[in-house]
């Protein structure tokens, strides 16, 4: 992926979510890059939404046990680990704790899902224009082509649940962490 795309994607993440920055004491956009690299290390397909040649949103999905893109997935995973263990992050354990909070799937659902919506983000200045809907529809189409039937969506209380309801998603479980 081109560096300018990575930079814009990290900028979107940084502007929208904390991603463990406050607790980890990480400098600048370090947590945004860590999160982006972790997303890319598991993502099967990634879709970008642009307006006037500027990335205004992106979405991706992961597929459990996929053997595709192994080299690039490992590269991005390594980049995330390097950043976590760098001097840019004061409290490394805080990053690991933050990540573990969102990787919680109940054991009775382990075999229900084929994969996960790894990311869906739209710049707050471009919301309400149908970009989120277009991105999610594209991800659903690509996942279907990839023979997937059930994608899990893990999110937090900042999520717009009405959006997912309108898209036909079904809430299976709600947990507070």
Model-predicted segments: where are they?
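Conserved GNAT acetyl-CoA-binding A-motif
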Residues: 114-115, 143-156
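Conserved beta-strand in the GNAT
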Residues: 54-63, 103, 116-121
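Active-site rim helix/loop that mediates acceptor-substrate recognition in acyltransferases
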Residues: 23-46, 51, 60, 82
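Conserved beta-strand-loop-alpha-helix junction that forms the acyl-donor binding cleft
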Residues: 118-127, 152-162, 177
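Helix-loop element at the rim of GNAT/NAT acetyltransferase active sites that forms part
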Residues: 3, 10-27, 63-66
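Conserved acetyl-CoA-binding loop-helix of GNAT-fold acetyltransferases
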Residues: 122, 128-141, 166
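Conserved acyl-donor/pantetheine-binding loop and adjacent beta-alpha core of acyl/acetyltransferases
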Residues: 65-114, 177
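Conserved active-site alpha-helix within GNAT-family acetyltransferase domains
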Residues: 133, 145, 157-174
């Amino acid at each position: 992926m081109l560096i300018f795309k990575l930079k814009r994607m990290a900028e979107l993440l940084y502007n929208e979510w904390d991603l463990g920055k406050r607790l980890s004491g990480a400098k600048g956009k370090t947590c945004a890059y860590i999160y982006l690299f972790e997303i890319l290390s598991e993502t099967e397909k990634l879709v970008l939404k642009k307006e006037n040649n500027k990335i205004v949103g992106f979405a991706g999905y992961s597929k459990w046990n996929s053997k595709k893109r192994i080299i690039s997935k490992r590269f991005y995973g390594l980049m995330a680990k390097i950043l976590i263990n760098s001097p840019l992050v004061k409290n490394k354990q805080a990053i690991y704790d933050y990540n573990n909070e969102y990787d919680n799937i109940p054991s009775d659902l382990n075999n229900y899902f084929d994969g996960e919506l790894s990311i869906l983000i739209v710049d707050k200045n471009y919301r309400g224009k149908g970009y989120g809907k277009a991105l999610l529809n594209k991800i659903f189409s690509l996942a279907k082509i990839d023979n997937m039937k059930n994608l899990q969506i893990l999110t937090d209380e900042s999520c717009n649940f009405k959006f997912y309801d309108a898209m036909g998603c079904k809430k299976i479980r709600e947990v507070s962490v």
